[in-house]
Amino acid sequence: MKMYSKFILFLFFLLLSASAYAGGGGPDSHDVAVHFPPSFASYHDADINGIGAILRHRISHTPFNLVASLVFLAAIMHTFLSSKFLYYAHKWKAEHQKKIETGCASESSTYLPAEIFHFLGEVEVVFGLWAVVLSAAVIFFYDWHTFVNYVSGVNYTEPMFVVVIMTLASSRPILKLSENIMSRIAAVFKGTLAAWWLTIMTLGPILGSFITEPAAMTISAMLLAEKFYELKPSKKFKYATIALLFVNISVGGTLTHFAAPPVLMVAAHWNWDLPFMFTNFGWKAVIGILTSNAMVFLVFKKEITSLENIFKLSQLKNEIREKYIHSDFLKKDLKMAEERIGHDLQQEFTRIKTAAKESTLTACSCLDDGECNLLEETFEQEFEDLKIQQMSVSVPGLLPRDKRPKLSDPNWDKRCGNVPGWIMAVHVAFMVWTIINVHYPAIFVSGMLFYIGFAHVTWPFQNTVNLKPPMLVGFFLGGLVIHGGLQGWWIAPVLGSLDEFPLMLSATILTAFNDNAAITYLSTLVPGFTDSLKYAVVAGGVTGGGLTVIANAPNPAGQALLKNYFSNGISPLLLLTYAFIPTMVMGLCFFLL
């Protein structure tokens, strides 16, 4: 008990120290700022020949470069092991659940290693987790102020934008609008599963050039989940579809100069406008998307045909539910049955209470009247508390309204019903506002706060506003940009030493292990880039954007929305394998056309 008191006292004084430090205004103004990370010019290696020699020189100049890259490598390896962590987490949870069922463990207990492995298996937390390790390394090698200056200087606009646009794009009005548009196109081809699959995989990515890639990814992934993944296709088809989606989204934003993050990073610097993007990238991307879709469709045509009956049955069920099942009458009948059960249950509670009270009050023979009255009063309160606690778990609907716990309808987001046009229009306005102000976080974040209020007011036409997936994706991207800012010391020399084809190939490969926007941004810092080299590095960056979850900013959004359809999450190795052929097709389109 003494040790516990000392620990509490220590935490209290630690909190006071932090408050005093904050109240003091932080670091002194005379603290000398360390240039971290060092500028490329500070290496003075222009006269050094050979990539190996340049990199060795930069490591000797700033040893922390190697540390930062080793931490980044560890984070990448962690992403490839995430499915293994989830496998053991699920296995241990199942074993612990059996112990609970057999009475060998308490119902409220949990197996801590399983929870830790589940946390480590969440791809969205990987880079944020390793950013903590990187931060500790910066503080150890330099100091606290260097760390603060670095993280304060990192541009978090893209992670913040993805959080906001993903929240808006996943709203019921936007999804209904997108579904209505795509259903009209799919209806031209009789509204079959094949028509829906091809429409989503073609139109969704191309829309990314106008509504931004993260929004296109969110809409496409949610529609694929509803129309395709719910049908439980084979493991091969699942991976082929998500890999193709990632590749298509990555190149689908190249019809314009403002929608794809890797293009946005260079467009202003190199004066690339909309006509330039469409004539040099856009039409080639469309050909690549159509070609890749056709190839995957032909490979899995037999399976799509076998899934058609299941798809038609699910569509028919939805139509029958909307037209013929009168849910209001059913709810009324169920409510009456609930009241009858509630009456019987209340009688049973009274019987239990009477028996327990008689047994408890036998102790009154040893107590005076005051103590006996107190015992009776305590029993009444304890019984009422236990009754409410038990009913909250088993039959919360039978409790009085003021005692009921807040519950959410698990099928609320799957309900039928249309959304008024004016609500759709307001949601489109929110998205347009966000896209127009993409460079101004204070403005588009304020717009999101306004949207949350609007969604609350119009709740009957909304799905549950679930901020967890967007926030996790934002955490992922935030961690990635913190790591990416310290990788330029080796990426820039590699990009600057290559000719067109090797540069495009290298950009594609590097993109698999670093965000493609970071790759293209670093290319703007390389002096003497010709127009053909500029084309090659951007083409390589967008081509490789589907190889891994970290390759393109919208990928974590798709991963977060679809991961539950894959056992133990999405395997990075299988994703890489199934994305290889579509990536080759896109690369050939950009290189040969």
Name these PLM-found stretches:
Residues 1-25:
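N-terminal secretory/membrane targeting signals
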Residues 22-30, 66-70, 75-91, 243, ...:
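Juxtamembrane and boundary regions of transmembrane helices in multi-pass small-molecule transporters
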Residues 54-65, 116-124, 145-159, 274-284, ...:
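Interfacial loop-to-helix junctions that mark the boundaries of transmembrane helices
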Residues 61-65, 153-160, 186-199, 231-242, ...:
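Membrane-interfacial loop-to-helix junctions in multi-pass transporters
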Residues 66-87, 122-139, 155-167, 219, ...:
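Hydrophobic mid-bilayer segments of alpha-helices in multi-pass membrane transport proteins
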Residues 99-105, 140-152, 170-179, 200, ...:
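Transmembrane helical segments that form the transport core of multi-pass membrane transport proteins
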Residues 168-179, 207-219, 252-260, 509-522, ...:
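Short helix-coil transition sites and intra-membrane helix breaks within transmembrane domains
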Residues 190, 194-254, 265-266, 521-539, ...:
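Hydrophobic transmembrane alpha-helices that form the pore/transport pathway of multi-pass ion
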